[in-house]
């Protein structure tokens, strides 16, 4: 989940978006019968999470259902080109809006579909996530659209951006939020035709209830936002548990990793870079706090030691370097300090003031 606005904002503006057409997703066949769908971001309003379809001779499992009904409908249209089998399972990895707000597409098309998530994820979806999103509903996105309307009035070239934002807001306004119908605690193994599909939860990581999916026969791991290509998003994370979870993923016999955003990975270099950064931040944060430094001071002190792993993620792109410093290092270090101050609750932490 990443946005320059609130992560799950909705708008109540009555705007016509009939003429706006979303492009089809990029479809990547990761392995036989395993397809990744990468949908277009909603401009500055937010990214859309990856969706993955696992095909079998008895049906389909969809991992993560995108951030809007329109996005998931485009993904389903592509799935229908690949198979006439029904979608039997939708697994939502965590509560961030861009991974589950499109679930209604599947429950409408397949009334018997099972919607699966970790028990903590269902708890978050049912209440705290809604409250977390409220500022965007009430102020941030309406203000964003108003700004775009003013810009488009002055410069017609800005009209496509406005059209896209209006479409996004209408989608968020009208999305029917579908809660999981099946939950689990630690592991859940599903048999879907010829495939064995393992759902696993190790610890609180990015959220209290992160699910990753493992296909042991195919040696594929699907991570949700536990890993993002190129840079993970550490807001409200659980540092020690997140590292434990990545270590568990690393221990699997996984030849391919499909992240929560971005293209699939056919080696573990990006995974290891994230693990290295997290280990260093955990160690540096503890040491700095003992010496009386605050989280911002600790972050600045450790940044030079993170450069090699940063380059694995950013390839020294200036924009990505800045995202690395904010989304991963800054936010993770603040959560390290929160964790050092005592046990973390499941409550969603606010964005650190900068």
Predicted feature residues:
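Divalent-metal (often Zn2+) His-rich catalytic cores of metallo-beta-lactamase-fold enzymes
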Residues: 220, 240-297, 301
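Conserved beta-strand hairpin/beta-sheet module of binuclear metal-dependent hydrolase folds
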Residues: 27-81, 211-223
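C-terminal regulatory/interaction regions
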Residues: 290-354
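Bacterial N-terminal signal peptides
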Residues: 6-16
């Amino acid at each position: 989940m990443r946005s320059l606005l609130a992560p799950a904002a909705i708008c109540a503006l009555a705007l016509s978006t009939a003429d706006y057409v979303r492009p089809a997703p990029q479809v990547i066949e990761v392995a036989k019968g395993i397809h990744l769908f990468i949908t277009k971001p909603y401009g500055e309003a937010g990214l859309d999470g990856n969706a993955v379809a696992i095909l079998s001779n008895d049906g389909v499992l969809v991992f993560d259902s995108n951030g809007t009904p329109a996005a998931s409908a485009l993904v389903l249209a592509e799935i229908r080109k690949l198979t006439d089998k029904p979608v039997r399972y939708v697994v939502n990895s965590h509560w961030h809006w861009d991974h589950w707000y499109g679930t209604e597409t599947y429950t409408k098309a397949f009334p018997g579909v099972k919607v699966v998530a970790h028990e903590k994820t269902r708890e978050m979806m049912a209440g705290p996530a809604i409250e977390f999103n409220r500022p965007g509903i009430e102020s941030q996105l309406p203000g964003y659209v108003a700004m775009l309307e003013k810009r488009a009035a002055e410069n017609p070239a800005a009209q496509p951006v406005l059209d896209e934002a209006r479409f996004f807001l209408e989608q968020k306004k009208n999305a029917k939020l579908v809660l999981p119908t099946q939950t689990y605690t630690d592991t859940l193994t599903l048999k879907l035709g010829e495939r064995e599909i393992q759902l696993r939860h190790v610890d609180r990581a990015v959220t209290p209830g992160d699910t990753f999916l493992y296909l042991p026969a195919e040696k594929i791991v699907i991570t949700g936002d536990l890993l993002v290509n190129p840079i993970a998003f550490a807001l409200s994370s659980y540092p020690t548990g997140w590292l434990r979870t990545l270590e568990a993923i690393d221990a699997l016999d996984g030849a391919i990793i499909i992240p929560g955003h971005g293209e699939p990975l056919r080696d573990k270099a990006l995974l290891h870079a994230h693990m290295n950064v997290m280990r260093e931040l955990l160690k540096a944060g503890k040491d700095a706090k003992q010496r009386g430094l605050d989280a911002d001071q600790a972050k600045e002190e450790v940044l030079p030691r993170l450069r090699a792993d940063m380059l694995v993620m950013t390839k020294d792109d200036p924009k990505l370097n800045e995202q690395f410093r904010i989304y991963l290092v800054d936010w993770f270090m603040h959560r390290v300090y929160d964790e050092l101050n005592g046990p973390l609750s499941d409550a969603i932490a606010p964005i650190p003031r900068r």
